Amino acid sequence: LRETKTVPAPPCPITLLQAVPKGKIIESIIQKATELGVARVVPLLTERVVMDLDDKHAARKGEKWQQVAIEAIKQCGAAWLPRVEAPVTPKEFLARAEKFELPIIASLQPGAQHPRQYFEKFQAQYGRKPQSACLWIGPEGDFTAAEVAAIAAAGALPITLGKLVLRVET
């Protein structure tokens, strides 16, 4: 006999928009994101990403990375499997015009705030926590100025975890 449990969906599904780093680091990022409960991972092919994929190879990478998430969920015992998509450019993702209640972007720019501050401001303004969020993480060398401008124009708020420059996998 097996015991079954009903586990509610996360209250604020998070989409991780992660620039693809060199080597197999993306697999570790997907694994950790799965363990932390991210709802979806969208690998990004930014201008500074050193990976050139045609549609067929991009689809294969998406399938391979989905398998990484499956293995991670088996290992950690999480109840929800994130969807890992095939890689897209930031422009392609923005063209989808998806709406998130709290879109944020990791930033090295002045004026960036800790994510907690944005969550608190949202709570104060709407009397509840956000029901969806996305987090943009750039590549080594960060997003280009044009990419940051496009992402910010779509409503993403700049966040920081402090004064240190963190590695992409952190």
Which functions belong to the PLM regions below?
Residues 145-170:
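Structured adenosyl-cofactor binding patch, chiefly the S-adenosyl-L-methionine
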Residues 30, 55, 117-119, 147-150:
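Short amphipathic alpha-helical segments
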Residues 87-136:
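A mid-sequence, solvent-exposed acidic-amphipathic segment
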Residues 11-15, 131-133, 153-161:
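Glycine/charged-rich beta-loop-alpha catalytic/anionic-binding loops adjacent to active sites
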Residues 2-105:
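RNA substrate-binding interface of SAM-dependent RNA methyltransferases
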Residues 130-150:
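A C-terminal functional module that forms or caps the active site or interfaces directly
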Residues 50-51, 113, 168:
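Generic structural signal for helix capping and beta-alpha/helix-loop junctions
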